Regions:
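N-terminal glycine-rich phosphate/pyrophosphate-binding loop and immediately adjacent elements
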Residues: 2-154
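A short, glycine/Asx- and small/polar-enriched loop/turn
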Residues: 94-95, 218-222, 278-285, 406-408
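Short coil-to-beta-strand
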Residues: 99, 222-229, 405-414
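Helix-rich C-terminal "cap"/substrate-channel and partner-interaction subdomain
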Residues: 124-160, 308, 388-420, 424
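Active-site/ligand-binding neighborhood in enzyme catalytic cores
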Residues: 130-264
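Mid-domain catalytic core of redox enzymes
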Residues: 240-247, 273-404
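A conserved beta-strand/loop element that lines the FAD pocket in flavoprotein oxidoreductases
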Residues: 260-274
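Single conserved hydrophobic/aromatic residue that forms the stacking wall/gate
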Residues: 421-440
Length: 440
């Protein structure tokens, strides 16, 4: 063990834990990341699928890694490269497809095939979404205040929050109507929001996918419109709204973070599950590992989810009953599944022509928002989705390091999938998804 006493110990080596550790180490603190696996990365890990094939185990594309984090942690210095892709597509059962391109004119012509009105409306839609992104982005870096608290810190936080909107108003950015529109947008379903702009089912379905992917929401769910923003506010190489592949898989991100941490004197203690957080006089002061070792720290950060933190590694006696019950009743339900497929060759799609830039990005299988909501209804009722929403990509087109020469790797993300206690039933839904792919 490198040290037994630190300024800060971080339980869990996912990308959030590593980012926190890197900033603290850069500030001169003695930091340790404690990870149960023999490797760090959490949901951003690159693993070997078959000899020669690399796959991203969970997350699969990159956009929301903030550019300031990229710069501050010098991630490019430690080998991180994001490769942008130029388009995406939704494939329909009748052989048609809607392609979404980063090029304005190509995108206009693609939408106009389905609706000239929608092609005209898309520019207004894009401007409105970008306006919401500009409002939200600064808030993501603010610590949210507790509106029920009278602590000076929270009161000051609320004042800062109010000042932010007041300043926007003074600059002509947010008037009374704009504030109303923003609050309305945050609470809308993505279905209702898109209905205000578009008439084509495939255009609406393509855009709605960004609001439900990786969530336990359907396109009719209130609040799903807000999720859409997270797929527009990211950027790659300064291009806002762009997406890309991390060269070598998503694990290259956390590998670069780990290198940055070590370069600033931080430690990574891998293969060391934490079984208990030590608490004395209502303050955490260390952890106990599975092998019985103890690591002490002045401050403790948990990169685990709220349930694992307070129900698994903190003893119940250390928590107020109302807090314990609130955490126990907090819903965390998985709704997504992922297939990683090694390919002998590139698929030949019935709809997307060979060489079309739309084929380099994310490819969706769905017919309409109504079909997506039906898949969500199946999941809510405890059934496997009969017509699941599929979001797939082939990173090896842009990044040949992911597969042997001439071969390819396909990532397939599926909405909606039953929770882990039903994994014994996976063969049938996996066959269904594979059949959907083969039909395209």
């Amino acid at each position: 063990m490198p040290k037994t006493k630190y300024d800060v110990a971080i339980v869990g080596g996912g990308h959030n834990g590593l980012t926190t550790a890197c900033y603290l180490a850069k500030a001169g603190l003695k930091v340790a990341v404690i990870e149960r696996h023999s490797y760090v990365g959490g949901a951003a890990v690159s693993r070997e699928l078959h000899p020669g094939w690399t796959y991203s185990n969970c997350s699969y594309v990159c956009s929301l890694l903030r550019p300031e984090i990229f710069r501050d942690l010098e991630l490019s210095k430690y080998g991180l490269q994001i490769i942008p892709y130029e388009g995406s597509a939704t494939m329909l059962d009748d052989g048609r497809f809607y392609a979404h391109y980063s090029d304005h004119d190509l995108n206009y012509r693609s939408i106009a095939q389905f609706s000239k009105k929608d092609a005209e409306a898309y520019e207004r839609f894009g401007k409105d979404v970008m306006r919401q992104c500009k409002i939200i982005k600064p808030l993501l870096k603010m610590t949210p205040p507790d509106p029920t608290s009278f602590r000076p810190k929270d009161i000051m936080g609320l004042l800062e929050f109010a000042k932010y909107f007041a300043a926007k108003d003074e600059l002509g950015g947010l008037g009374e109507k704009e504030i109303y529109d923003t609050i309305r947008f945050w609470t809308m379903s993505v279905r209702d929001y898109l209905e205000e702009y578009f008439e084509s089912d495939v255009v609406k379905a393509h855009l709605a996918g960004s609001a439900i992917i990786g969530t336990a929401l359907g396109p009719y769910s209130p609040g799903s419109a807000y999720v859409l923003l997270h797929h527009y506010m990211g950027e790659v190489d300064g291009t806002v709204g762009a997406w890309g592949y991390s060269r070598g898989g998503m694990g290259s991100i956390t590998k670069a973070m780990a290198a940055s941490l070590k370069a600033n004197g931080g430690d990574i203690i891998a293969g060391s599950p934490v079984t208990k957080i030590l608490i004395k006089n209502n303050r955490s002061h260390g952890v106990v590992l599975e092998n019985g070792d103890e690591i002490f720290a002045d401050k403790l950060v948990s990169n685990l989810d709220v349930k694992r933190t307070f129900l698994k590694v903190v003893e119940k006696k250390e928590l107020p009953d109302d807090f314990y019950n609130a955490v126990k009743n907090f819903k965390i339900r998985g709704s997504s599944g992922k297939l990683n497929i090694a390919l002998d060759d590139l698929p030949i799609w019935k709809s997307i022509p060979e060489g079309d830039p739309a084929g380099t990005g994310d490819l969706h299988i769905t017919q309409s928002i109504e079909e997506m909501e039906g898949a969500y209804d199946d999941w809510k009722d405890g059934r496997w989705s009969q017509f699941p929403y599929v979001d797939m990509c082939i990173p090896s087109i842009n990044d040949p390091t992911m597969a042997p020469q001439g071969k390819h790797y396909m990532s397939v993300f599926v909405q909606y999938v039953r929770s882990e206690e039903h994994t014994s039933e996976l063969q049938s839904p996996c066959n269904l998804v594979c059949r959907l792919l083969l039909e395209k």
